């Protein structure tokens, strides 16, 4: 027996504590172990007695008021109170609700022992749990049912054990194991189970008699307990069944949704594919419906000299074959010819086209094609260079640029035949004058820029510069670079129009004494070249019986007459030169 137990017994005798109070003091002692379950069961059974109930509760509230180093008194009192609420009389829970403030104050219990360990946390947590249980009546009822069921099972197990009976002394909380007489008989019988149970049957039967309810109240309590347990089991099974049914229904609904979504996606994909194909076929049908004839334009890669690819005109018109070569060609190659469907066509030779008064009417064809008419918006057919002018078609598939006249002069078989003819000033005809800006302005990226003449940048001293001496004869190319020749046709001999029948260049003294100087001076007295009015009619080049080499030089008087008639000064040049800058 320990010193604390001896001291406790002395206090019990001095203070004349009753049996119930002594048991409560023993269960809530300051010993370093918890209260015994058997002792708490005895105290719970005593709560059904009204006198014992008051003694037990008064001692419990007294233990809850301890503090400091007696923190075990408080903690064990809370543990005992929790057990009494669940397994004792219902009056315990009712009195605890009335004095719940005494339990709530224990949430701030503080104590730190010598080792620095916070021992008050055990009391704080236990008081919080107990307050929450007292405030929740439904939870309290459920836990009371479970605790009573557990207590009954423990009692049945204790009555079924006949080998070792655990008994507790009145003055001590430590169990004492006593060997019963049945164990000795079990050893004598050789350990047979039948002899063992037979020897213990009288004792077991007496314990079963004690476990039976003695009063009608206990019998009613056990009946309510059994009904509550069966009801709880049935409700739990029903909840599980409903949960399973709900999960099964959700899974079926989800699978049904998935099966509906997949065909819709397939239908959408199937609808999208034919739609795109139908759009493409509709566009192709519209393009095929437009009339198209003649050769298809071939477009070369601008950065390489690869195989030309076919290019379709979206407007249905015929695009003449154009050769788009390297944008940085080497010396000797011909300039790139770009295809512009709205540009002004050029001719392969320097022949004038008859004047057409109505741009929207059908053009006049030559004698060989007199019975045919041209449609301005229809599909154009390729025609020779001497044919009529078509407003939206090209004669040779190219568009005039700044150097197209020089290409025509180099590739022409009849160089400078129209040197003395006066060009018409109609925008729908092709002029042989290299400096005629009204009809030879190219439809390129800069249509508004005017063509420069020698007088525009040389002024009145234009006749003093011999431009023929600045032009040198380039080396003849190894092969023909004309993209408009038919395959297999013989290439024409390269002719330089600047060096045909070129006389001996005049010296400065000869230029000063020549009559051309006076006439040019009379025309070049102003800051620029005066505007020449268009003549009503111009004879074609073939009507002129003389070439540029057969013209006679004009004197000053003749030049004045020519100026009064409105003939441009380019027609009054000496007959011996074919310089395009002095025409």
From Swiss-Prot:
Ubiquitinated. Its main location: cytoplasm. Residues 12-144 form the ENTH domain. Residues 482-581 are annotated as: 3 X 3 AA repeats of N-P-F. One of its GO terms (cellular component) is clathrin vesicle coat. The modification Omega-N-methylarginine is found at residue 170. Coiled coil: none annotated. One of its GO terms (biological process) is regulation of endocytosis. Sequence repeats lie at residues 301-303, 313-315, 326-328, 340-342, 358-360, 375-377, 482-484, 496-498, 579-581. Pfam families: ENTH. Residues 437-448 have a biased composition (Low complexity). Highly expressed in brain. Detected at lower levels in lung, liver, muscle and testis. A 1,2-diacyl-sn-glycero-3-phospho-(1D-myo-inositol-4,5-bisphosphate) binds at residues 8, 11, 25, 30, 63, 73. The NPF repeat domain is involved in EPS15 binding. PANTHER family: EPSIN-2, EPSIN/ENT-RELATED. This is Epsin-2. It comes from Rattus norvegicus. The gene is Epn2.
């Amino acid at each position: 027996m320990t010193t604390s137990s001896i001291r406790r017994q002395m206090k019990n005798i001095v203070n004349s504590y009753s049996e119930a109070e002594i048991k409560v003091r023993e269960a809530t002692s300051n010993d370093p172990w918890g209260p015994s379950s058997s002792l708490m069961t005895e105290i719970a059974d005593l709560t059904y007695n009204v006198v014992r109930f008051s003694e037990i509760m008064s001692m419990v509230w007294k233990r809850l008021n301890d503090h400091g180093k007696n923190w075990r008194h408080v903690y064990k009192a809370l543990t005992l109170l929790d057990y009494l609420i669940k397994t004792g009389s219902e009056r315990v829970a009712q009195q605890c609700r009335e004095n719940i403030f005494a339990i709530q104050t224990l949430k701030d219990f503080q104590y730190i022992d010598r080792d620095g360990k916070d021992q008050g946390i055990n009391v704080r947590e236990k008081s919080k749990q107990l307050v929450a249980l007292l405030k929740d009546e439904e939870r309290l009822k459920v836990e009371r049912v479970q605790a009573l069921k557990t207590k009954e099972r423990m009692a049945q197990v204790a009555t079924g054990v006949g080998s070792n009976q655990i008994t507790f002394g009145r003055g001590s909380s430590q169990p004492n194991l006593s060997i019963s007489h049945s164990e000795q008989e079990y050893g004598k019988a050789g350990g047979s189970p039948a002899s063992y149970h037979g020897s213990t049957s009288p004792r077991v039967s007496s314990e079963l008699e004690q476990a039976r309810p003695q009063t009608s109240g206990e019998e009613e309590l056990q009946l309510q307990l059994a009904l509550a347990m069966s009801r709880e089991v049935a409700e739990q099974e029903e909840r599980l069944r409903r949960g399973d049914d709900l999960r099964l229904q959700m899974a079926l609904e989800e699978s049904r949704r998935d099966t509906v979504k997949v065909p819709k996606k397939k239908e959408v994909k199937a609808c999208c594919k034919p739609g795109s194909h139908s759009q493409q076929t509709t566009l192709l049908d519209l393009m095929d419906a437009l009339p198209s004839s003649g050769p298809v334009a071939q477009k070369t890669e601008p950065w390489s000299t690869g195989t030309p690819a076919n290019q379709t005109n979206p407007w249905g018109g015929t695009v003449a074959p154009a050769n788009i070569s390297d944008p940085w060609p080497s010396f000797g190659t011909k300039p790139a010819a770009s295809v512009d469907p709205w540009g002004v066509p050029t001719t392969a030779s320097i022949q004038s086209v008859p004047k057409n008064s109505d741009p929207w009417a059908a053009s006049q064809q030559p004698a060989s094609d007199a019975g045919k008419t041209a449609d301005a918006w229809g599909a154009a057919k390729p025609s020779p260079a001497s044919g009529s002018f078509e407003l939206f078609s090209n004669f040779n598939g190219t568009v005039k640029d700044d150097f197209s006249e020089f290409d025509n002069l180099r590739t022409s078989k009849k160089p400078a035949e129209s040197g003395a003819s006066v060009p018409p000033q109609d925008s729908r005809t092709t002029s042989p004058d290299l400096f005629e800006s009204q009809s030879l302005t190219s439809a390129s990226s800069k249509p508004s820029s005017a063509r420069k003449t020698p007088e525009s940048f040389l002024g009145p001293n234009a006749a003093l510069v011999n431009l023929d001496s600045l032009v040198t004869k380039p080396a003849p190319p190894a092969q023909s670079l004309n993209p408009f020749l038919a395959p297999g046709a013989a290439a024409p001999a390269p002719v330089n129009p600047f060096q045909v029948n070129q006389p001996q260049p005049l010296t400065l003294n000869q230029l000063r004494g020549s009559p051309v100087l006076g006439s040019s001076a009379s025309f070049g007295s102003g800051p620029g070249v005066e505007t020449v009015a268009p003549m009503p009619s111009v004879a074609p080049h073939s009507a002129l019986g003389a070439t540029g080499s057969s013209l006679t030089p004009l004197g000053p008087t003749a030049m004045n007459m020519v100026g009064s008639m409105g003939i441009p000064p380019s027609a009054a040049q000496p007959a011996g030169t074919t310089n395009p800058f002095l025409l």
